[in-house]
Amino acid sequence: MDLITKLMVKPDSEDFPLSEFGLSESPAAEAVRAVFPNTALDPLEAQAALAFLLLKYRVSVSITMGPSFDFVYDDSQQFLADNSVINPPLAFDSSHQGHRSGQAVVWNRIYRVIDGLAALLQAEDFGDGTSMWDRTMIYVASDFGREKKRPSGANDWGTGHSVNNGVQVFSPLVPGDTLLGGVDGNTGLTYGFDPTTGAPDTGRTMSEPEIFSGLLGALGVDTSGSGLPDMPAMRRS
């Protein structure tokens, strides 16, 4: 089977005549469309669909994806009708000036896509009695944090950049339903955790090498000789 066919989500149709070019939809396309039905309009769903197929057919072992900055809406409905916005804007006005409301909308999209990917990967046999999801890690992070100051009484407000941040990891390879570290309720800033036990440590700030090493350890990568610290709290025992 050629690579184009393996990765083809769209079905053969009059508007998209694959058969005229000797092509066909992927054998997994129907299952993918059932989970991500809006790939034609939703750039995040389209990325997720392609990500699954790249993993399924062993074309790639690592995928980077994220919401588009573009404002996308379903123009088949009345202009900006309820639920017609497919991809909310993430450019300056939304990410800086309306950060809180923008985050609220985009988190829902990210979680839905993660849930869909997990479902598809769980149904995919790795070949040894385990599923592809059993060997997958989804790492959610931004390129920077946001300042934590809220103007008195404000429901929405502008934010500047901050080096203080947190990440989320979804995987059977890490301890589930677990918060490592925490957030100081007085400052909104994060604090760290004990690398061995995972116990919160309000006086500790985690370093990049520690988090990086913890992710590699959860994936089973041997970091001996690298100088990276051991982070057993970040991997499932």
Question: What are these regions, as identified by a protein language model?
Answer:
Residues M1-D128:
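Anion-binding catalytic surfaces of enzymes that hydrolyze or transfer phosphate/sulfate esters
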